[in-house]
Amino acid sequence: MDQEGNEALSLLKACEKKYPTSPEEAKLEVFENKYSSRDYEIEFDCPEFTSLCPVTSQPDFGAITIRYIADKLCVESKSLKLYLYSFRNHNSFHEEVVNMILTDFLEIAKPRWIEVVGKFRPRGGIAINVKATHGEK
């Protein structure tokens, strides 16, 4: 595989075990989409997402699915893993988490279309599912 143009992917080659402690500290990295002339869908399935309840600070568990059609840039998966991990000690409502992820993807990758779905485990007998989208598919 051609490595040219991937020098900016600092997290992929790093063996360091210092993880970001908040979404604001985390860094999504991107690489050039060599097939930007066509529409194709990229899907990240992240079944082990955790964050904290903003009221009780108890852990919330869920699955995050991110589907997008890239334009000129694609999000690198290790940076996404570390970014999502950074929510582990972050106090947020589920709706806020999903929209935050969507906003951060839009800012860094500028996809043609994106959908972020959060399916959260029941707390108090109620499961919460949140879907946020942007753009035309």
Predicted regions and their residues:
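N-terminal intrinsically disordered, cationic/polar leader segments
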Residues: 1-137
